[in-house]
Amino acid sequence: MRLGLLSLFMCSTMLAADWPQWRGPERTGVSAETNLPTKWSETENITWKLAMPMWTGATPIIWREKIFLNVAEDEDKLALWCVDRSNGNVIWKRPMGSGNRKARKQNMSSPSPVTDGKYVWALTGTGILKAVDMDGKELWMRDIQKEYGRFGLNHGYASSALLHEDSLYIQVLHGMTTDDPSYVMRLNKMTGKNVWRVERPTDAQRESPDSYTTPTLVRVGKSLELVITGGDVITGHDLATGKELWRGTGFNPEGNQFHRIIASPVAVGDLVVAPTRIRPMMAFRGGGRGDVTSSHRVWTNNNGPDVPTPVTDGKLLWVVNDRGIAYCLDFQTGKEVWGPERIRAGTYSASPVLADGKIYITNEDGVTTVFRASDKFEVLAENVINDYVLSSIAVSDGQLFLRTQKFLYCIGQRRKK
């Protein structure tokens, strides 16, 4: 069954030339495209570049001929931009409200948009959630902070919405600067109305309730479960009702009150890997009920990341930590295949992407290391663009899209399938 699910996952990824959400078509950071660029610089192998007004942690979202960007236009205003992927020209801009501010590394443009090819949904760190069509016509808008209270995260809200079929799934896990409860909600994507909203209580204290992760889905037989990490726990929820089905603990064994989680869970089949604040990183099998800490925990590893979300093809799992130390693990067992291996020194906030048999990972200085996605460590290239980078690379039709503080770069030549 697991092999069949993995085959289905890989086939669906291969058919997708779009990058419709933060971690790509299957929420795993994987593209099955081939013949992608390996080398570039500020002047080499750049098809076009578009000036950006400010940095962001949001990833470019791509559908056919259009790119969608969450943009902090200045110290106050936020906007959703639509860009022509053929030449980098801005097609339209739609306001996403005011209230932008700097929160440590972040500003309020950090959540990535999502699209189904007919509509685009954009969420900001100020709580504005808006649906527009591909021409920018507004379908609906909500102000989540106005409805449910201010987001209380120490570093500002940064979780992206999860789009699945007819619904958006949004988490607000916080506690550092608020006494309001954390919650998860499902919205009808066409109306913006709640299907459900459930609170998600934990025993986490001070900053530990804060989670900057994005939800994912784990498949159990013919059904799917919503997986949320944060507040020192991992939880699985029923898609229809939001009811918590299972909970795994052990992510904060020392009871550190500043144990916020940034790196998101990644799932293939019924197995989900959940990073925390470096250690421990754990894998759980979906489908349990109640406390699954012992019954469904598959493995534990103490060499996880803090900020970059790991990437997997369902067989191997590649991890790059904040200091540029890389590991390769067996996805199913957690056994280390290789590592620690040093890539270019620096601070890493972007997440690695797997494509064309290669891992692409960019540090905050704009250096993208390309290393082979295999059970043997081999650096293939180091590509330098001297600019500040928090955003992860997006892949579409043979091209790479890298967003820096000053520019959005389109790298390589397009090859339509």
Role assignments for model-derived ranges:
Residues L15-K417:
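Noncatalytic, solvent-exposed loop/strand surfaces
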